A protein has these predicted regions:
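Weak global preference for isoleucine
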Residues: 9, 13, 24-27, 31, ...
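A generic structural signal for well-ordered coil/turn residues at beta-strand boundaries
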Residues: 18-21, 32-33, 38, 93-95, ...
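Donor/substrate-binding cores of folate-linked one-carbon enzymes
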Residues: 1-88
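Active-site-lining helix/loop region of Rossmann-like oxidoreductase modules
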Residues: 66-125, 131
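Short secondary-structure boundary/capping segments
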Residues: 14, 28, 89-91, 122, ...
Length: 179
């Protein structure tokens, strides 16, 4: 696998990977080391960590069901992992998921998509802490997209937009602290 460590799903979202996947592996001595005999991939685009986790679990289950008979009959070819393609997926820190108006709208949306109940995307709204549960990019070329100043939250047509260094993103769901 490309990502090894505590948070591979969140890391692939934060880094903007197009695809991710699962591997059927022999257990090695290190984290996610060992040869693999089967792999399957799926698209990352637009999925949050919970959705991607579920999709990968289903994909892994299907791959295992397909691979087990081949393993039992010794019909698999084992492939050594290319260590040069490996990236460490460190545990997500709370600071990494704090929304930052000086970052791009895309980076902030990725923070929201990579977040979870245990590591939420956070920001300050009217001086109070809040979790941003869902967000999406907006098409700035669209005439309906509002111009929002960096660091400002703005409501247009019943929708909430957060201004960033390169435009804005739409805040779709918020959970205030203590709720």
């Amino acid at each position: 696998p490309r990502w090894r460590g505590a948070a591979p799903i969140q890391r692939c979202i934060l880094e903007g990977d197009d695809v991710t996947g699962v591997s059927i592996m022999r257990i090695g001595h290190g984290i996610d080391t060992g040869d693999y005999c089967a792999q399957a991939t799926c698209s990352v685009s637009g999925k949050n960590a919970d959705q991607l986790t579920q999709e990968l679990a289903n994909l892994g289950g299907d791959l295992l069901v397909d691979t087990l008979p081949k393993l039992a009959s010794h019909e698999v070819a084992w492939t050594v992992q290319d260590e040069g393609l490996v990236t460490h997926a460190a545990k997500i820190s709370k600071a990494e998921l704090k929304l930052d108006p000086s970052a791009s709208a895309l980076d902030n949306v990725r923070r929201v998509l990579a977040s979870s109940d245990t590591a939420p995307a956070r920001c300050e709204l009217v001086g109070k802490g809040a979790r941003i549960v869902d967000a999406s990019l907006i098409d700035m070329a669209d005439g309906a997209a509002p111009s929002v100043q960096q660091g400002v939250l703005s409501v247009h047509g019943g929708r909430v937009f957060a201004g960033c260094t390169d435009g804005a993103f739409e805040v779709l769901s918020v959970k205030p602290d203590g709720k």
